[in-house]
C-alpha cells in the first residue's frame, strides 16, 4: 500500500515538475510580436549644416533620383523618399521601411566633365541594429550608408485618413566608413568635417 502511494506521489511530483518547466519555457520565450505592414509614407534625410557646408566647399552638388525629392531648408538639404513597403511596430517603431528613388552627388572634374555617385532604393532599418542602406553600382549591391542612433528616437502614433501612422524621428545618422571612403575617393576636394550625415525621420502609414 505504502509502495503504491509512494509511486503515485512520485508520479504526481514528476508531472508537476514537467508542467512547471513547460510553463516557464512559454513565459521566458514568448513569440515575437510581428510589425504592422507599411503601405505608404516617407523617409526624410536632413543633412547637418556642417555636412552641407563640406559638400559645398568640396564642389559636390546633391541631387535626387525620382520619385524622391530634394529641398534646401536653411543651410541644410532635405531628401524625401516615398515609402514603398515594409513592416513597423506601432508601439516601438522598430522594423524596416523600403523606399523608392534615391540620391545623387555630382562633382565637377573640369569645366565640361562631371563625376557622380548615386544610391537608390533606400531602406531604413530601426531597432537594435539601425541603419540606412542604399543600392550602388552596376551589380546592384546594397551598402550601409549610415548607422542610426536610436537612443533618443521619438516614436509617436496618430490617425489620419482612416489609417494609423507611426512617426520615428530625432534619429541621428552617422556616415558609414564605406560611404566616407567612396565620397573622398570620388570627390578628392570633399573633406567631411564630421561623420554625422544628418537626421533621419520615418513617417509610415500602416495598413
Question: Can you describe what each PLM-predicted range is?
Answer:
Residues 2-17:
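Bacterial N-terminal signal peptides that target proteins for export
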Residues 11, 28-29, 114:
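Intrinsically disordered low-complexity regions specifically enriched for long asparagine
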Residues 13-15, 31-34:
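N-terminal membrane-targeting segments
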Residues 16-27:
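Bacterial N-terminal signal peptides
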Residues 28, 66-68, 134:
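Intrinsically disordered, low-complexity boundary segments flanking structured domains
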Residues 33-94, 170-207:
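N-terminal segment immediately downstream of the Sec signal-peptide cleavage site
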Residues 70-144:
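Predominantly extracellular/secreted and cell-surface proteins with exposed
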Residues 129-178:
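Extended amphipathic ligand-handling, pore-lining, and cofactor/metal-binding catalytic surfaces
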Amino acid at each position: 500500500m505504502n509502495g503504491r502511494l509512494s509511486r503515485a506521489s512520485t508520479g504526481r511530483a514528476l508531472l508537476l515538475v514537467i508542467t512547471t518547466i513547460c510553463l516557464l519555457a512559454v513565459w521566458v520565450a514568448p513569440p515575437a510580436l510581428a510589425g504592422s505592414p507599411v503601405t505608404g509614407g516617407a523617409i526624410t534625410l536632413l543633412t547637418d549644416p556642417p555636412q552641407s557646408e563640406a559638400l559645398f566647399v568640396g564642389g559636390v552638388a546633391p541631387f535626387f533620383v525620382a520619385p524622391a525629392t530634394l529641398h534646401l531648408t536653411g543651410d541644410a538639404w532635405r531628401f524625401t523618399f516615398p515609402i514603398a513597403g515594409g513592416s513597423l511596430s506601432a508601439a516601438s517603431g522598430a522594423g524596416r521601411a523600403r523606399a523608392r528613388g534615391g540620391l545623387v552627388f555630382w562633382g565637377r572634374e573640369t569645366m565640361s566633365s562631371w563625376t557622380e555617385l548615386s544610391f537608390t532604393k533606400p531602406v531604413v532599418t530601426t531597432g537594435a541594429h539601425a541603419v540606412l542602406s542604399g543600392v550602388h553600382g552596376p551589380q546592384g549591391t546594397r551598402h550601409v550608408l549610415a548607422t542610426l542612433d536610436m537612443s533618443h528616437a521619438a516614436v509617436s502614433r496618430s490617425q489620419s485618413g482612416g489609417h494609423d501612422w507611426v512617426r520615428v524621428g530625432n534619429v541621428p545618422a552617422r556616415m558609414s566608413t564605406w560611404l566616407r571612403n567612396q565620397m573622398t575617393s570620388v570627390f578628392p576636394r570633399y573633406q567631411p568635417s564630421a561623420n554625422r550625415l544628418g537626421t533621419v525621420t520615418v513617417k509610415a502609414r500602416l495598413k
